[in-house]
Regions:
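N-terminal, positively charged/glycine-rich alpha-helical extensions of SAM-dependent methyltransferases
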Residues: 1-15
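Conserved beta-strand signature within the Rossmann-like core of class I S-adenosyl-L-methionine
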Residues: 150-158
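C-terminal alpha-helical "lid/dimerization" subdomain adjacent to the S-adenosyl-L-methionine
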Residues: 158-211
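Conserved alpha-helix/loop element of class I SAM-dependent methyltransferases that forms part
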Residues: 26-44
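Class I SAM-dependent methyltransferase SAM/SAH-binding core
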Residues: 49, 54-112
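A conserved beta-strand element that flanks and buttresses the S-adenosyl-L-methionine
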Residues: 123
Length: 234
């Protein structure tokens, strides 16, 4: 991922968060599940890191959702794409205004160079799939090394099927869903844009990388079309 790496669809009129909600069925439910699961892991004086945080929506949810029992965690969102920077700045200002006690920071950098340490929770929501394949394992290894014992890595990824017939059926079912919100020309244009950016793994490949990084198991907790959300514990 270069410094010029960016998402053109982040500039859409409806905004990125609404766009992804209309693109991935059940996206809001996924975020709700992640927030609920986070309460089992977030601890005071530890780092809670969301890589590829886009607009910072999940980071803000962590701050609000964990404040009643864990007020002194350090919340970090990491984002590389400049299209999100203005909204991240606005969200950071709002969080500090509404929750002046919160220790929250958005770092505009490449996660491949991030020093994970003292982490009780790391999240990655549809981020690994945009990284060069050669870098994904190293990032997972760094995450594992930076997690405290008992800490969790919660992630969501677009996957591909190992069976081509199933892949075709699920893909067209997914397109049928998207047609409820987007014109066919918009869907095609986005597919062209993402073709050289988004290169998903199979679920078995993801499991294999996690195991090699040190995680003993990864448990899926959310699925829709070819998208999967899962949790791995150190």
């Amino acid at each position: 991922m270069s410094k010029n790496y960016d998402f053109t669809f982040a500039q859409r009129e409806e905004g990125f968060d609404d766009h992804i909600e209309h693109s991935i069925r059940g996206y809001t439910n996924l975020l709700e599940d992640i927030l609920s699961l986070s309460r089992n892991f977030v601890e005071d004086e530890t780092n809670v890191v969301d890589i590829g945080c886009s607009t910072g929506k999940l980071t803000e949810a962590f701050v609000k959702g964990n404040q009643s029992f864990c007020k002194y965690a350090n919340y970090v969102g990491i984002e590389l794409a400049p299209s999100f920077f203005t909204e991240l700045d606005a969200r950071h200002k709002r969080i500090k205004t509404e929750h002046d006690w919160a220790n929250v920071n958005f770092e505009k950098k490449d996660v491949r160079g991030y020093d994970f340490k003292n982490c009780s929770l790391v999240t990655s929501i549809f981020t690994l799939q945009f990284m060069p394949r050669k870098d994904r394992f190293n990032v997972l290894q760094n995450i594992y090394n930076g997690l405290n014992h008992g800490g969790a890595f919660i992630f969501a990824e677009k996957t591909v099927c190992e069976d081509s017939r199933l892949q075709e059926m699920i893909t067209f079912n997914f397109y049928d869903y998207k047609r409820k919100h987007f014109e066919a020309s918009d869907i095609l244009e986005k597919e062209k844009t993402l073709r050289n950016m988004l290169k998903p793994n199979t679920w078995k490949e993801l499991e294999g990388m996690l195991e090699c990084a040190g995680f003993k198991t990864a448990q899926p907790f959310w699925r829709n079309h070819m998208f999967v959300g899962a949790i791995a514990i150190k």
